[in-house]
Amino acid sequence: IDHVTGTLAAVLLVLISIGIFAAPLVLSIFAPGWLVDDRPEFDLSAGMLRITFPYIMLISLTALAGGILNTFERFLVPALTPVLLNVSLIAAALLLSQHLEVPVTALAWGVLAAGLAQLILQVPALIRLGLMPRPRWGWKHSGVRRIMKQMIPTLFGSSVAQVNLLFDSIIATFLVTGSVSWLYYSDRLLEFPLGVLGIALATVILPNLSQKHAKANTHEFSATLDWALRLAVIITVPAAVGLAILAGPILITLFQYDAFQPDDVRMSTYSLIAYSAGLPAFIAVKVLAPGYYARQDTTTPVKIAIAAMVSNMLLNILFVGLLLIQGFEGPHAGLALASSAAAYLNAILLYRGLRKRQVYSPEPGWTRLWVAVSLACTTMGALLLFMTHDTESWLQASAIFRIRNLSLTIVFGVIVYIFIGMVAGLKTHHLLRGAK
């Protein structure tokens, strides 16, 4: 642990130093549209990039600490860690932005603060285990070398999502000014349920699946995956419906202050709705991929991720092109929609692979589950739409009114969903038993 921590920190420190110095060059590669049009966003983004570059080292060390904790079955802290980024960004947007000369730079400082908070959160748990690293250089250490060889396939597979995001950003820089920001705000709101549920589920089931595979217990391996998928459906489908319907009120409540105008809310709403459609698929990928990793199969998820990446790139061009031809005011939403479609392709291919290898077989009751979830979501969605159809009143309301009404609306929606779901036959106690 000491050698891995020290080597990782040293390598990242060098990369970060280069990144801070060469920020304009990096930005010209990943946001060429701003450079070609000589937009003012270029210099601003270069400055924000310099602020956020240290986050790479902070989150990498946080991930290493989280891996240590997961190994010793300490899941709570790593599962809660991603939430801090969303909380920090929201706090920076609401509290810090109004005190800065350029309000949007508050988000960059929010990212940096989140990195520090995420890393600090791991420390008490590591100390309690007696595993607080004492960084040491160990490039030639056998353990470091072994980890480097094992992590390359997983690292490549994980980077596919980032490549998709970069490709989206490149295209967005050629669209109307504000497209990158609208996608970013939408993505941040999508990352909240992904961080809370997706990463938490993946974190919990991976060691569980690994144990089942080591014991050659195929039935329990399949049952664990089935439980995780059912839980994902029960939570993510209503979350997707709620996020899409409440996109406007959520964006207004969190961001519609000062420079963030009603037009920004409308444009961000388009992309948030498109992202929301893919939420169940994004979570499903995080649940299904551990089914391969637990069996030491890191190659198949990488191949599938590459296929999804290529499809995402092609769909980006297709969807954005179609929206531009139709004269739609928010062609950037095509980028979000392409990401959602690619996520479904990823999830379907992962699912088919597990079925083909006969390591996963759905348990009875899926039809009843889908019927119950569909009825509950339809009822909840209709009521939420009725309660929030007047967006204009939200725009004119005070911050306190917005927060109060949004909170009450969400609570009401959750209650309606649970009630209708239980009436329709949703058995949540079966899911709780499946977690054991």
Model regions: which residues?
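Membrane-embedded alpha-helical bundles of multi-pass transporters/translocases
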Residues: 1-436
